[in-house]
UniProtKB/Swiss-Prot annotation:
This is AT-rich binding protein. It comes from the Eukaryota. Residues 110-119 have a biased composition (Basic and acidic residues). Its main location: nucleus. Keywords: DNA-binding, Metal-binding, Nucleus, Repeat, Transcription, Transcription regulation, Zinc, Zinc-finger. The keyword Nucleus applies. GO terms for molecular function: DNA binding; zinc ion binding. The keyword Protein transport does not apply. PANTHER family: GASTRULA ZINC FINGER PROTEIN XLCGF49.1-LIKE-RELATED, PR DOMAIN ZINC FINGER PROTEIN. SUPFAM superfamilies: beta-beta-alpha zinc fingers. The gene is ATbp. GO terms for cellular component: nucleus. It comes from Drosophila pseudoobscura pseudoobscura. Coiled coil: none annotated. Residues 110-142 are annotated as: Disordered.
Length: 375
């Protein structure tokens, strides 16, 4: 005799008194009353008869659509049970039909409701996870963009500082080419040079003096020294006492002021010219970008400028300053003079060390104590 069952969506077969659980090729039955697991149907029916006092189809049959529940059957069994006594012993026989729940669909509805709630919770959890992942991705993108902007700003600052340094250097170079006007008191030549000039019938002039004088004689015109890097040196002197005629002085003034040529105009003898050249070369102010090399180490070009030429094999590059040539020679010598004090890395140029400190150690600028002395 079969027993009623309901096939639910989660592959579980329910009876009205027990639950069939499927797992592959095997199954077992769970009692709804005490939750005991039974392996066969016979064990299940014997269990509910012995343990729970349920009889299977003893009095009459009921259809699967019976309208009363298990609680109604238990109440009827308590009120209308028939008791018979036989001999010494007594056997109680309760005629109770198999209870078929009128709320048999309750299990499937509850399971469906639980499944819906569980699925809704899972979907909500998945949505929360997706939302968190999107937020993390957006935050990571924002951090990347901020990092790129910071790097671009640092590069722009470095380029701006380099451009400012180049502008300052170019302004220094341009200012070094401006004529320097010096108005010192006059210097009288020694008696020996005056005697030599008188013997050679040369006109004696008073050369300018950079040192202070006690009482400078009032010259008729201001003497000046014009020193230009790109042109030849022009030394103009004004004699305090002129023995020649006024016409000779006018001719000499016309030669000095009228001619635009960059030549050396002097009206002194050979010994006086040598003394004037010596004083002018010794007393002129040095260029701020002048080199420490001797005059013989530089090569003068046709336009009057001095160039420092790299003498490494067949290089032959020309530089205006010796410091630039020394920096260039590092390329040939493979010397790394700029060292990082944090990681012991060495570089050929200071700009590479500055970039390394910014990117690797997040430091700005270069400490003066770690750089070699500038040329």
């Amino acid at each position: 005799m079969g027993f009623p069952r309901i096939l639910s969506k989660n592959n579980k077969i329910y009876t009205k008194l027990g639950e069939f659980c499927l797992s592959g090729d095997s199954f077992w039955i769970v009692c709804h009353t005490c939750q005991e697991e039974l392996q066969t149907q016979d064990q299940f029916w014997k269990h509910i008869q012995d343990e729970h006092n349920f009889l299977h189809g003893v009095a009459k049959e009921h259809s699967r659509t019976s309208s009363y529940c298990l609680t109604d059957v238990e109440a009827a069994a308590a009120t209308s049970g028939a008791t018979t006594s036989q001999g010494a012993g007594s056997v109680t026989s309760v005629t109770v039909p198999l209870a078929l729940y009128h709320c048999s669909t309750k299990y499937s509805e509850d399971d469906q409701r639980e499944m819906d709630i569980h699925e809704a919770q899972q979907q909500q959890h998945q949505q929360q996870q997706q939302h968190q992942q999107q937020q993390q991705l957006q935050q990571q993108q924002q951090r990347d963009v901020a990092k790129e902007l910071a790097e671009l700003h640092a590069n722009a600052v470095a380029v701006a500082s380099a451009a400012a340094a180049a502008a300052n250097e170019s302004s220094t170079r341009s200012s070094s080419g401006i004529d320097i006007k010096i108005e010192p008191p006059c210097l009288t030549l020694p008696p020996e040079m005056q005697a030599a000039a008188a013997a050679s019938n040369a006109t004696i002039y008073h050369l300018p003096q950079l040192g202070p004088a006690a009482v400078p004689p009032p010259p008729p015109t201001t003497g000046f020294v014009s020193a230009n890097v790109s042109t030849s040196t022009t030394v103009s002197t004004t004699p305090p006492n002129v023995t020649g005629s006024h016409s000779v002085m006018q001719q000499q003034a016309g030669v000095l002021t009228g001619s635009g040529l960059s030549t050396l105009s002097m009206s002194v003898g050979p010994s006086t010219a040598m003394a004037a050249a010596l004083l002018s070369t010794q007393e002129l102010p040095k260029d701020s970008n002048s080199t420490t090399a001797s005059a013989g180490s530089a090569v003068s070009s046709d336009d009057g400028e001095r160039w420092y030429i790299c003498d490494y094999e067949t290089c032959g590059l020309k530089f205006k300053y010796k410091s630039r040539m020394e920096l260039h020679r590092v390329v040939h010598s493979k010397e790394r003079r700029f060292n990082c004090e944090l990681c012991s890395a060495s570089f050929k140029q200071s700009c590479n060390l500055s970039t390394h400190r910014k990117k690797k150690h997040a430091l700005r600028g270069i400490k003066s104590e770690i750089l070699p002395q500038r040329f």
